[in-house]
Every structure is written in C-alpha cells, then in structure tokens.
Design a protein with these regions (language model features):
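Residues that form generic nucleotide/phosphate-binding pockets
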Residues: 25, 62, 69, 73
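Coiled-coil heptad-register positions
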Residues: 42, 49, 67-70, 74, ...
Length: 92
C-alpha cells in the first residue's frame, strides 16, 4: 500500500515522569479502545473479538517493556528522546 500521509506525533526529549505520562496515556487509551471493541462484539454477537483481544495482549506487553525503560531512566536520572509517527494508508 502507498502511504497517504505520515504525521509526526511525538518528537521531543522528556523526563522519565513526563514520558511515563505521555506513553502510558497513549497505550491505556488504545487498550481501552480495544476493550470496548471486544465488549461490543460480546454484546452484538455473543463472542469475543479475537483481533481486539490479541491487540490488548500486544499492547500490555509493550507497556511492560516501556515501564522497564522508564524505571531504568528514572534510576539513572536520564531524559528520554521519544519519536513517534503515524502512517496512514488506504486499504482495499
């Protein structure tokens, strides 16, 4: 697929506390979105949304990895450079 747009979401340096707030908020919102998708599937179809459940598991794994990095940065009194981009493509 051809990338329609690439948007710079985050590109800055943060303390571990700031990085924690930004990243955990992003991940928690995404996890909650997928929980709602799964709940909707349960109500409408009487079954789990496997795609949403898999995504939740992936996101929770990422949260654990990020938490380790943030703790290490805090312990070493280091700032974190974070870059994040969103790529938007058309799907058939």
């Amino acid at each position: 697929m051809e990338i329609v747009k690439k948007i710079n979401l985050i590109d800055d340096e943060f303390s571990s506390a700031e990085a924690n707030e930004i990243l955990m908020d992003l991940y928690n919102k995404n996890i909650n979105f997928n929980k709602i998708q799964n709940f909707s599937s349960q109500i409408r179809f009487g079954e789990d949304d496997e795609k949403a459940l898999n995504r939740i598991a992936q996101l929770k794994e990422s949260v654990s990895s990020i938490a380790e990095i943030l703790e290490e940065a805090k312990a070493q009194n280091k700032k974190l450079k974070i870059k994040s981009f969103i790529e938007i493509e058309y799907e058939d």
